[in-house]
């Protein structure tokens, strides 16, 4: 009986050992589903096991009932997609209003339309980037989407610069500027800015990327550090020019107010209030632009691909807000566009005030 008990204990030990070995083998052969991204997608997008997930990572959950892998969406990507949706909706409305209203086809509104078109493309790019990132994860698609976004945002910033130059010239040469400014000249200016923006967007597609040299990647893959340095430097130059022009605009406004004061022997309260309001508006315009883009531009210069991806998201998301605010600052505050909105949505709104082309400083 002791022999049979010993044999039984020995068989139980062998069975337990066999079960343990099988469990270990199963664990070794089963991938860890808590890691970022499927292996193939991570390798294709450059989002491997490094600490920085760039903007191209998604986590993988266990298989569902149908056997398909469920992709966990990054909340930051959702925020960018939502931002892109709002941007696209706002700017599509502005583009439609300018295109469908003959009175809004003056040179000033052509510049505003260019800004709205660039922001519309940027919003669509954010939406497509989200869709393709989780549906078609590939190097080619990633490269095309990044180039598209670079070109769109570059065109947006360039259009802002063109509007600033137009505002400055309209105030500095108020007597002769409107007679010299033509629609053809504005179109040529915008053609030049869009050509430069398109060139910046094509650079990564034409080979200036870090797909072949991971060590040269920036905080936004597949852009190289030298490429984002060029983009950031270009932004700093544009921001510096805009700052200089807006300071000059404020000087012109205050000089005009001082001349009125000399003529009237005092600065009338309406003129003082209008001057302060104009300067405050310029401060809001420039402050919004700087607060939106400066953090991302600075981080692109000082950041590194080893930094956590959250730093890139946290600075890029506010930059997209600039394209969300632009329609409010440059379009919806304008009386002609407000009237066009009434005509579009109501159809019965009648105004006895005829359309007039306002100066860019009033936009």
Curated annotation (Swiss-Prot):
Entry's localization field: Cell membrane
Residues in the Extracellular compartment per record: 1-75, 132-143, 207-231, 306-310
Residues of this chain annotated as glycosylated in UniProt: 2, 9, 52
GO cellular component, one term: plasma membrane
Membrane topology designation: Multi-pass membrane protein
Region entry Disordered, spans: 28-51
Modification type Phosphoserine: residues: 357, 359, 361
Residues with lipid group (S-palmitoyl cysteine): 346
Listed Pfam families: 7tm_1
This protein's UniProt keywords: Cell membrane, G-protein coupled receptor, Glycoprotein, Lipoprotein, Membrane, Palmitate, Phosphoprotein, Receptor, Transducer, Transmembrane, Transmembrane helix
Record-annotated membrane-spanning stretches: 76-95, 108-131, 144-165, 187-206, 232-250, 279-305, 311-332
Cytoplasmic face of the membrane: 96-107, 166-186, 251-278, 333-363
Summary of the tissues where the protein is detected: Expressed in the brain, with a prominent distribution in striatum.
Single Gene Ontology MF annotation: sphingosine-1-phosphate receptor activity
GO BP terms in the entry: adenylate cyclase-activating G protein-coupled receptor signaling pathway; G protein-coupled receptor signaling pathway; positive regulation of cytosolic calcium ion concentration; regulation of metabolic process
Family: Belongs to the G-protein coupled receptor 1 family.
Protein's job: Orphan receptor with constitutive G(s) signaling activity that activate cyclic AMP. Promotes neurite outgrowth and blocks myelin inhibition in neurons.
Name the record gives this protein: G-protein coupled receptor 6
Annotated organism of origin: Rattus norvegicus (Rat)
């Amino acid at each position: 009986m002791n022999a049979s008990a010993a044999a039984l204990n020995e068989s139980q030990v062998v069975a337990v050992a066999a079960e343990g070995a099988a469990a270990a083998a199963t664990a070794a052969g089963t991938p860890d589903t808590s890691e970022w991204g499927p292996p193939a997608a991570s390798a294709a997008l450059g989002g491997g096991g490094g600490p920085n997930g760039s903007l191209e990572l998604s986590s993988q959950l266990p298989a569902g009932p149908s056997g398909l892998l469920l992709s966990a969406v990054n909340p930051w990507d959702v925020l960018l997609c939502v931002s892109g949706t709002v941007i696209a909706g706002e700017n599509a409305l502005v583009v439609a209003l300018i295109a469908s209203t003959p009175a809004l086809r003056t040179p000033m509104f052509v510049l505003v339309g260019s800004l709205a078109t660039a922001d519309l493309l940027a919003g669509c790019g954010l939406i497509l980037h989200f869709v393709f990132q989780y549906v078609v994860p590939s190097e080619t698609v990633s490269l095309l989407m990044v180039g598209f976004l670079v070109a769109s945002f570059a065109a947006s910033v360039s259009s802002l610069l063109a509007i600033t130059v137009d505002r400055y010239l309209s105030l500095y040469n108020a007597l002769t500027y409107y007679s010299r400014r033509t629609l053809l000249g504005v179109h040529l200016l915008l053609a030049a800015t869009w050509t430069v923006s398109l060139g910046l967007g094509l650079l990564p597609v034409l080979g200036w990327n870090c797909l072949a040299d991971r060590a040269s990647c920036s905080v936004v893959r597949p852009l190289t550090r030298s490429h984002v340095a060029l983009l950031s430097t270009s932004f700093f130059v544009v921001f510096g020019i805009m700052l200089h022009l807006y300071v000059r605009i404020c000087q012109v406004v205050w000089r005009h107010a001082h001349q009125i004061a000399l003529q009237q022997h005092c600065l009338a309260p309406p003129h003082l209030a209008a001057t302060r309001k104009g300067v405050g508006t310029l401060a809001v315009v420039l402050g919004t632009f700087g607060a939106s883009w400066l953090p991302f531009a600075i981080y692109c210069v000082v950041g590194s691909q080893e930094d956590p991806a959250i730093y890139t998201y946290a600075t890029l998301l506010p930059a997209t807000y600039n394209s969300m605010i632009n329609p409010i600052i440059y379009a919806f505050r304008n009386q002609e566009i407000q009237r066009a909105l009434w005509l579009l949505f109501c159809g019965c709104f009648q105004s006895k005030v005829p359309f007039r082309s306002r100066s860019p400083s009033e936009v």
